[in-house]
Swiss-Prot record:
Homotrimer. Forms a dimer of stacked trimers, the same faces interact. A CsoS1-CsoS1D-CsoS2 complex can be isolated following expression in E.coli. Part of the carboxysome shell, a polyhedral inclusion where RuBisCO (ribulose bisphosphate carboxylase, cbbL-cbbS) is sequestered. It may control transport of RuBisCO reactants in and out of the carboxysome. There are estimated to be 6 CsoS1D hexamers per carboxysome. The keyword Repeat applies. One of its GO terms (cellular component) is carboxysome. Keywords: Bacterial microcompartment, Carbon dioxide fixation, Carboxysome, Photosynthesis, Repeat. The keyword Calcium does not apply. This is Carboxysome shell protein CsoS1D. The gene is csoS1D. Residues 55-157, 158-256 form the BMC circularly permuted domain.
Length: 256
């Protein structure tokens, strides 16, 4: 069995790199196999290096999506829709286009469903859903291992703004409702809690914990962009309780 060159020097285009692989043909049955070329090996090595350069900005695991948050995420989802009680993993990475590689790794690791994948100018985000927590966490672990990161290496959240405003006026309520088309409407006289975080994805954890803690209405949840923004409304006492739960959730991540 003798190796025969798969590409002669004279056949190569000007300026193209030399391919050093060879095709080995068997004289007995005519079968052949292709030996990996040096150029292919360098490509594989370069791809592995690129994956390891991906920066983990946000890693948010929600054990059980609350009804309002699940419904809200469904209104903005372009993929599979979540249902209340599903587990959810939200990840944000940098650079933005790296989210395609992260998504590919996560989906091939388990039976999770892809709800959202957003490519921004600087960052990329994705949302994974499944009814079993272990399935979602497994995909997350595989991604972390692939990019050489850990949960503790994610960017710590910081709170840019937090406030409770009591007894919203009619004019204010109308403008809020016209700006936010995906969530519920706020009514005049309600109290409102607003929260702004960086990175953006952490507002999902705040929203989920706030809904668990009190009888409030989710008005708006923006988990993409430079900052995450959460708006809740309800009775003053309920809003204050939900606000405390939301801030506590952010602080727990910061102190992890």
């Amino acid at each position: 069995m003798e190796p025969t060159s798969s590409l002669n020097r004279g056949d190569r285009k000007k300026g193209s790199s030399l391919v050093t692989g060879s095709e080995v043909q068997s004289q007995s049955n005519g079968a052949s196999c292709f030996i990996t070329t040096d150029s292919e090996k360098s490509l594989v090595s370069r791809q592995a290096s690129q994956v390891e350069q991906i920066e983990l900005r946000t890693y948010v695991f929600l054990d059980s999506l609350q009804p309002q948050l699940a419904a809200y995420m469904g209104t903005v989802s372009r993929g599979f829709l979540p249902i209340p009680g599903d587990s959810c993993l939200w990840m944000e990475v940098s650079p933005g286009m790296a989210v395609h590689r992260v998504t590919d790794i996560a989906l091939k690791a388990s039976n999770v469903r892809l709800g959202q994948m957003i490519v921004e100018r600087a960052f990329g985000s994705l949302a994974l859903y499944h009814k079993d927590q272990s399935t979602v966490l497994h995909s997350g672990d595989v991604v972390l291992d692939a990019i050489g990161s850990e949960v503790r290496k994610r960017t710590k959240p910081s709170t840019s703004w937090t406030e409770v405003i009591c007894a919203i006026t009619p004019d204010h309520a109308v403008l809020i409702n016209r700006q936010n088309r995906s969530g519920s409407m706020i009514q005049s006289g309600m109290s409102m809690f607003i929260l702004e975080t960086e990175p953006a994805g952490y507002v999902l954890k705040a929203a989920n914990e706030a809904e668990k803690s009190a009888n409030i209405t989710i008005i708006d949840v923006k988990a993409v962009g430079a900052f995450g923004r959460l708006t809740l409304a309800g009775k003053e006492g309920d809003v204050e309780e939900a606000a405390a739960a939301a801030i506590r959730a952010i602080d727990q991540i910061s102190n992890y």
